[in-house]
Structure formats: structure tokens, C-alpha cells
């Protein structure tokens, strides 16, 4: 499902940003 893929990408970006310390 396209929506799920978009949500997954946002979640992944959020996780990466969190690990780097941006968020």
C-alpha cells in the first residue's frame, strides 16, 4: 500500500534523525 510505504519512510527518517540527535 502506497500510504504504508510513505508512513514507513517518514518513520525511518524520524528514527535516523533521532539517532543522530536532530530530534
From Swiss-Prot:
Stated name of the protein: Septenin 2b
UniProt keyword Secreted, yes or no: yes
Swiss-Prot/TrEMBL keywords: Secreted
CC annotations in GO: extracellular region
Localization of this protein: Secreted
Chief place where the protein resides: secreted
Functional description taken from the UniProt entry: May act as an antimicrobial peptide.
Expression across tissues: Expressed in skin glands.
Family membership: Belongs to the Frog skin active peptide (FSAP) family. Septenin subfamily.
Superkingdom to which the source organism belongs: Eukaryota
Amino acid at each position: 500500500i502506497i500510504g504504508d510505504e510513505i508512513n514507513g519512510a517518514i518513520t525511518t527518517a524520524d528514527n535516523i534523525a533521532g539517532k543522530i540527535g536532530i530530534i
